[in-house]
Amino acid sequence: MASADKNGGSVSSVSSSRLQSRKPPNLSITIPPPEKETQAPGEQDSMLPEGFQNRRLKKSQPRTWAAHTTACPPSFLPKRKNPAYLKSVSLQEPRSRWQESSEKRPGFRRQASLSQSIRKGAAQWFGVSGDWEGQRQQWQRRSLHHCSMRYGRLKASCQRDLELPSQEAPSFQGTESPKPCKMPKIVDPLARGRAFRHPEEMDRPHAPHPPLTPGVLSLTSFTSVRSGYSHLPRRKRMSVAHMSLQAAAALLKGRSVLDATGQRCRVVKRSFAFPSFLEEDVVDGADTFDSSFFSKEEMSSMPDDVFESPPLSASYFRGIPHSASPVSPDGVQIPLKEYGRAPVPGPRRGKRIASKVKHFAFDRKKRHYGLGVVGNWLNRSYRRSISSTVQRQLESFDSHRPYFTYWLTFVHVIITLLVICTYGIAPVGFAQHVTTQLVLRNKGVYESVKYIQQENFWVGPSSIDLIHLGAKFSPCIRKDGQIEQLVLRERDLERDSGCCVQNDHSGCIQTQRKDCSETLATFVKWQDDTGPPMDKSDLGQKRTSGAVCHQDPRTCEEPASSGAHIWPDDITKWPICTEQARSNHTGFLHMDCEIKGRPCCIGTKGSCEITTREYCEFMHGYFHEEATLCSQVHCLDKVCGLLPFLNPEVPDQFYRLWLSLFLHAGVVHCLVSVVFQMTILRDLEKLAGWHRIAIIFILSGITGNLASAIFLPYRAEVGPAGSQFGLLACLFVELFQSWPLLERPWKAFLNLSAIVLFLFICGLLPWIDNIAHIFGFLSGLLLAFAFLPYITFGTSDKYRKRALILVSLLAFAGLFAALVLWLYIYPINWPWIEHLTCFPFTSRFCEKYELDQVLH
């Protein structure tokens, strides 16, 4: 046994020596004393605050024990009551390569599959996922803010929770108070290198000091159930326009301009905020009163040159009657003079600047759900009884930044300015503008010609220019049957035409026999016996279609009519001759004359006419110098502009459905859109975010343009009319979803319906596309039910939301598919629907509006 012990002892000594030899030289192990030994100095430590005890505990412990805590047993480690005061301040020694390699690697996790990720992302997008509670609360908070601004007053309970700062959850309505929130570190940009510091603060442990900044919530005030901080009005100076209006009003009334513009500057200037006290303000104790307001000495009026305008709460403080006094937690009224007095006056260093910085750091104007700009105009409000679950959802809402609104407004303004500078401005007004001028016509004489143009009351370019830029115009989107028939009739007439040569050798032009003078001109038309042969090798087959002025298969070298490429006996199928024979005299009457007229595309329906260049330019047409026949040009391709058609006979510019959303008919039209976007669109985007609003804006605009292309095919329309009514539909959906929250929901519904009805009646006037308004509103209504945030009022409401999302998306897909089929496959013609966009109040009220779905 002794030998065994001896051997065992020797083995243990050898192993310990080996371990000591392997111990890294930079490893130091220090075992701290037990916790009760460190807290033994006396009972006076127990009377100190918890943070102060932790600071003393931290100073009494060695500073090297936290460097290598892995070597200490867990039983010897002290229990951390407050981890914020037990952070190590010692520097770690550089670790060797052996220590770095010995660290444990994190474990591997199985990555979610693509289908699971897509399914989870879709559920979070529509707000039906299981872990979407926090996001849903944020949506609900934002929706309450929007409702309070747009749809009137809320219920009383919901309004009180809405006035809470974002750090306080509305669910804390009982006797328990939440834990104090940690105030973020705020850096004063005006401190010029001086840190915020208490005057008596030394480099020693101390208890947290009460805040010296007046008018701002302290750390302990965040534990209160009700705080008056959210009642502070926003600091806002008068704009230049406001001061100009006041100055103009003062001049009209005979007053001094300085008195009118300086009314707000008569108060005593201060760079700090007065203490705010409200009737419903309830705090936890008297310490908050002592640490949140000025002493009597600091309430005196002292001039300040830091800020030029009066502070935020100064004007708000003056509006409170002197009879109003705050109430302590015990229910005892505190006099006003004692309420604004601090027990211990301290130095003023850093107080006033800190109040400004903290106010702007915590102050964020939020958008209430269901209440927004329109709700503020219509004085809507929440009802008084709202459950705590709904209140928690409303409290957690934050406002998005309206990136899409600013981008869209910038694009609209820039494009409108570029269009005006490039294409100019058409005649302004509501009637027809007639221009008369003497123009050289086909017969070689000057004639009086009228050009009728529709005036544009939007102060912008003409309809032809808007079509060329990308306006909604059905003949450019798909093949139109009536325009195709019109082109076929013109080609039939051209097939029987001939060359009219003037006898005085003044020129020639392609025309009909009835339009050529029998005495002053010679009409050249091939007959069965006078026409040239089809091919030089077969002289028996003669041509009967022709002749064409300045074009003949016998003289054209490129493309040549020979072999397998013989030109057909139909002049409407002849190609453009790019190279003629180099000979001054061919011996053919229709070839040796000077041609006076060539094809000209006039109007917006693809109509072609062989005429002079002067007449074509006067009629704002497109003159084709290279062609001799109308069948050789494609007028619709030239009128539509943008990208050329893949097949010249088949229009395919379907991208006009969304391209026209960024165009405007004029400056006034653009200003109306900018005002709408900076009020309604901006307010909705703060609620739902740019991605959701962008989807609703674009899809509802495309749907409205698609319907307008079906029912008003020959009317060029630009602007986001369908998108704007889709956003108005979002207001209705938001009203329906926040119906249980509003105090008077029916009044809000009637007010909003009156606005939409008024806009619909305005759409009965000319030049306003009511078809796009109607279908944009329907599509926006369906999309808003699927994409807008939704406040749930229970488990059944959550399942109802899922069903509503599915039904809304299916209904929108069905509506969009039906419109596509009606546009491309089964065109419909409902003449009565024209009255929805221009009602004929008189016999000539909608004249020249180009509403007819039948071309003449």
From Swiss-Prot:
Sorted UniProt keywords: Cell membrane, Disease variant, Endoplasmic reticulum, Growth factor binding, Membrane, Palmoplantar keratoderma, Phosphoprotein, Protein transport, Transmembrane, Transmembrane helix, Transport
InterPro entries xref list: Inactive_Rhomboid (IPR051512), iRhom1_2_N (IPR022241), Peptidase_S54_rhomboid_dom (IPR022764), Rhomboid-like_sf (IPR035952)
Record-level Gene Ontology MF annotations: growth factor binding; protein transporter activity
Effect of residue 189 to L: In TOC; likely pathogenic
Lumenal-side segments: 431-660, 714-715, 769-773, 824-856
Amino acid composition bias (Basic and acidic residues), ranges on this chain: 94-106
Organism: Homo sapiens (Human)
Region feature (Disordered): 1-115, 165-184, 531-553
Function of the protein: Regulates ADAM17 protease, a sheddase of the epidermal growth factor (EGF) receptor ligands and TNF, thereby plays a role in sleep, cell survival, proliferation, migration and inflammation. Does not exhibit any protease activity on its own.
Noted disease: Tylosis with esophageal cancer: An autosomal dominant syndrome characterized by focal non-epidermolytic palmoplantar keratoderma, oral leukokeratosis, and a high lifetime risk of developing esophageal squamous cell carcinoma.
Name of the protein described by the UniProt record: Inactive rhomboid protein 2
Protein's gene: RHBDF2
UniProt topology in membrane: Multi-pass membrane protein
Membrane-side (Cytoplasmic) residue stretches: 1-409, 682-692, 737-747, 795-802
Biological processes per GO annotation: negative regulation of inflammatory response to antigenic stimulus; negative regulation of protein secretion; protein localization to plasma membrane; protein transport; regulation of epidermal growth factor receptor signaling pathway; regulation of protein secretion
